[in-house]
């Protein structure tokens, strides 16, 4: 590997506590999407009930057009993924009706289990990568994020972009693009 560019999510070195354990602790009394995705079948049933509304709400909520932190706004522990997310009308012009239809068709054909399984595997990732504790990225690394990315606020009160060079021996710089989501 000659170099790495992190997009939206800065590199996080392995730690004793898994990301799932940390987020479960932080969000113990309220909804957090990664915790929600750990349930078998429940997220799929919600998302697949109306794929168009699901994608519109998720894409908008994670975009720079939505109110700040819309994706992470406090929700009750028993809320669903789509509860309290806005389905904007009209939808912002950065995603045409024709392009959205392509994604809708793909998810109607393939479902959401595969994408949700990526989040269900975070505990497995933590175990599998335990051999990499104290290992740093030695190749050139840069980071690019958007000022409107929700990742910056995943841990309340912590700037998720404050230390993008952690775990990198050859960090070349960080760029935050104003007003957008990367």
Show the residue positions of the predicted features:
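Short glycine-rich catalytic loops that host catalytic nucleophiles or stabilize transition states
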Residues: 169-182
